[in-house]
């Protein structure tokens, strides 16, 4: 067999001993914690032993070294055995394992990146393989390095569609540096898994998706060593037949034990039984990696030149996004773009044309696209920008919230926002996206209103930690800013003001331009308004909003192409709550819209220039 050298009996026994030590540690940790998933750990003990102490190449004292092989524990509830591995490797003190799930410990119930050996948070099932695909794509096509990527999945999560999106992606892009290990332990959380131990069906499914699929006895270290040696030339799925709770007498392969630690007396007895099978306490040292990953610096990536727009010219911010991203791509070869088969609408096709080797077509699989981006961003190897219609990011909200838990630095651009897209109708209109992205921890939400602001938003997003969302629009609107205008996160702009302003009007994107048009008509009636462009909806420029409100008799009017819930109006209301003498009035979309021309829809839903002018007059009259 090509490249496979069977380990000698001493090495095989050492791997068996390692697997049993991992079992013992998992049982001890979960019993001490009074919670956790020891049976899910025990089914994977031999897999983890062979992976980390025979197959993988890594520096055990430097888990995030860029040359290391990568590992993703997609079945994140088996975290105790991952922690046990790193204690076995000498990175964690063994005593720390007994602090599992304690508030004072970094060993959370599921893997999180405050642990140096965890690249992506897992635990919401079905997402690990997508992240692993992103790592493998980066290794093969961007780093062109020899590190390999391994992902351990449970059989229960194979019901998740996102797993099969990732399987398809790996096959399309020939990720021969990727190995998925399927821990087929038969039992789910509350019932047996749908296929139980029908290994041939698992194999046929993987093969149908273009993978090399190998069935093994998941408790045979020899079969596992052999299978990992065969993982070449195409993405490989090692389909391991295992038993949940392996090695735990009276519990192995029994239902109703998921997520239950062993009682102390029972744990002590089982640990003695397992310990008696260990022949040597000698530990296997990790094999170091081949050091061929390039040095990468993604800090302080700046546009090569200022924007080149002319005030008054018209451009849609979605197109300005594509132009800006392509331009930023010339500043760093680590800027990458991903799209969900909408590149001719989001205009990421401009990036593809100028940087074809750094564009990843993810097709219509938005959940996987976000996971791919998360994987690409790990260990600061790339700066990913994903784009699709903003409405379609709602499908990937779980992946986005897990990206935040992963402390991932990814940028998402959502186009076709609001009723202003027109005739395509409500299924295409993003009207919930601001609420969604504002709720994500440590997120930054950009809402640029012209081409200059959009270009600045792209540059800022590339250098901002966390999840960045850029909301772009379909209609063409006028350039209102000079090319040398300075933009910063959390810094709003006063677009129009006078000493006689009576109301502060806050709009963004399309509605900012409607507010400016309303100001023109109101001026003819000798009514002046102050118009603010927030630029970022999160964080919001509270100081400028308050200063403007106080200069306009405490009156604020927000207008947005978004539902009332969670958008600009609620963000502004939260910012000024408790401030005396300030009132906030909202104009927003109040029901599910319909098809129509953009101007007709803006008018129908009361967010056009006429509605703004009428609301301003109402506020003044009310006083």
UniProtKB/Swiss-Prot annotation:
Record-listed N6-acetyllysine modification sites: 6, 11, 144, 204, 232, 241, 260, 538, 603
Q: What CDD domains does the record tag this protein with?
A: TPP_PYR_DXS_TK_like (cd07033), TPP_TK (cd02012)
Q: Which residues carry this modification: Phosphotyrosine?
A: 275
Q: Where is the signal peptide?
A: none
Positions annotated as active site in the UniProt record: 366 (proton donor)
Pfam families documented for this protein: Transket_pyr, Transketolase_C, Transketolase_N
Kindly state which keywords UniProt assigns to this record, in alphabetical order. Answer: Acetylation, Calcium, Isopeptide bond, Magnesium, Metal-binding, Phosphoprotein, Thiamine pyrophosphate, Transferase, Ubl conjugation
* Modification Phosphothreonine, positions: 287
EC number(s) on file: 2.2.1.1
Q: Which reaction does it catalyse?
A: D-sedoheptulose 7-phosphate + D-glyceraldehyde 3-phosphate = aldehydo-D-ribose 5-phosphate + D-xylulose 5-phosphate
> Which pairs are disulfide-linked?
none
Matching PROSITE patterns: TRANSKETOLASE_1 (PS00801), TRANSKETOLASE_2 (PS00802)
Give the residues the record marks as binding thiamine diphosphate.
40, 77, 123-125, 156, 185, 244, 258, 392, 428
How is this protein annotated for GO cellular component?
endoplasmic reticulum membrane; extracellular exosome
Please give one Gene Ontology molecular function term for this protein: thiamine pyrophosphate binding
Query: Required cofactors, per record?
Result: Mg(2+); Ca(2+); Mn(2+); Co(2+)
Q: Which domain of life does the UniProt lineage start with?
A: Eukaryota
* Cross-link for Glycyl lysine isopeptide (Lys-Gly) (interchain with G-Cter in SUMO2), residue positions: 352
Gene3D superfamilies attached here? 3.40.50.920, 3.40.50.970
- Similarity section: Belongs to the transketolase family.
This protein's assembly is summarised as:
Homodimer.
- So what does this one do? Catalyzes the transfer of a two-carbon ketol group from a ketose donor to an aldose acceptor, via a covalent intermediate with the cofactor thiamine pyrophosphate.
What the entry lists under NCBIfam families is as follows: PRK05899.2-5 (NF004559)
Q: What is this protein called?
A: Transketolase
Q: Which organism is it from?
A: Macaca fascicularis (Crab-eating macaque)
